[in-house]
Amino acid sequence: RSRQRLLSAEGETQARTVGQVFQRHRLGVDEVLASPFARCHDFAQIAFGRVQDDRQLLGLLSQDSGRQQRIDHSLALLRRAVVAERNRVVVGHSSNIQQTTGVFLPEGGAVLVRPDTKAERGFSVLGELRPADWAALAQAA
């Protein structure tokens, strides 16, 4: 932890806002998975009150021997069905998101996907949320 970039005060505020959006809109959450990096783990913990660290969600910036395995794991998560009326939350790194979905997000953003066996990749991208979108959703009734 001491050598990692920690979640900033702005990141903590964003995490609380994300949690408020899920509560206010009664969005059910099944799993909360996160990269074990401190900022990812802490974001998930603050937003959802629980988190399961998943080493396979480490970033993809290096060309190490486990890179393809991490890509495959992320793709499997996106393809795997969730419990009805529930969501799987994955807090990770932009490199993973870009590699698996083709979407580039700023920190604090989200890509919404749905498993879809008819889609070429086995999932469909439904949309994106930018950091400012979370604040607007938190205010909406």
Regions of interest found by a model, annotated:
Residues 94-98, 116-117:
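Short, flexible beta-strand-to-coil junctions
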Residues 1-55, 60-64, 103-132, 137-141:
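Active-site-proximal alpha-helix that buttresses catalytic centers in soluble enzyme cores
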Residues 57-67, 71-79:
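All-alpha RGS (Regulator of G-protein Signaling) helical domain and cognate RGS-like helical scaffolds
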Residues 80-86, 115-119:
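A short, structured loop/turn motif at beta-sheet edges
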Residues 33-34, 86-92, 96:
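Beta-strand elements within well-structured catalytic alpha/beta cores of enzymes
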Residues 71-84, 134-141:
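A polyampholytic, Gly/Pro-enriched intrinsically disordered region
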Residues 18-21, 74-78, 98:
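A generic local structural motif
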